[in-house]
Amino acid sequence: MNTTLDHLVVIAPSLEAGVAWCERTLGVTPGPGGQHPLMGTHNRLLRIDGPGFERAYLEIIAIEPGTTPLRQPPLRRWFDMDDAKLMQQVHADGPQLLHWVARTDALDSALACCAAHGWDRGPALQASRMTPSGLLQWRISVRGDGQRLLNGVLPTLIEWGDVHPADAMPASGLRLRRMRLQHPDATALQTWADAVGLKGVEWHVGPAALQATLSTPKGEVLLGSPE
């Protein structure tokens, strides 16, 4: 089983606010993204791949105004985006790195590894959308309650089809240099990471937090989640 960081998830109060944050913080304008009718969200994307982080990208995601998710209550949006406290924080403080997604070539086995550690990562949903570069198809783990788990430190898991979105993204001038993950149960997380073949990220004991270091046109930038 091979697993690696796929993308970082920055949740924004609106997509316009997310674009402005990206330009102000990282010095670049994000590329186009898409809509997620099932979740009632939309995004903008940009490539951040670097040594050890092949095909990695940054996702800026927000609830799409005027839409109703096809995923009806009691099912909730992914990434805790129906969590009132979390979204209140995002609206008060602006876009934030709150989660990440890891891609794997054996999603069902990786989910079983989560379950073995007592983490219900949720079922695998099948999804697809057409893009100029071809049909994107993927399977992604989403809990019915939409929770990220472990304050976002445990990644959502994804398995892509033949086409990966980063292959069609132009170079952005950004490079992911380091991904640091902190949690009181870091030892168990490291054991899980070893079991699913996840390399390239660092696990540290401490309050739950994510930290990504990127090289940008503005110099080195540290993106971090609130502890």
Q: What does each model-identified segment do?
A:
Residues M1-L5, I11-T29, T41, I48-E227:
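Glyoxalase I/VOC metalloenzyme domain signal
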Residues T29-P37:
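Conserved catalytic-core motifs of GNAT/GCN5-like acyltransferases
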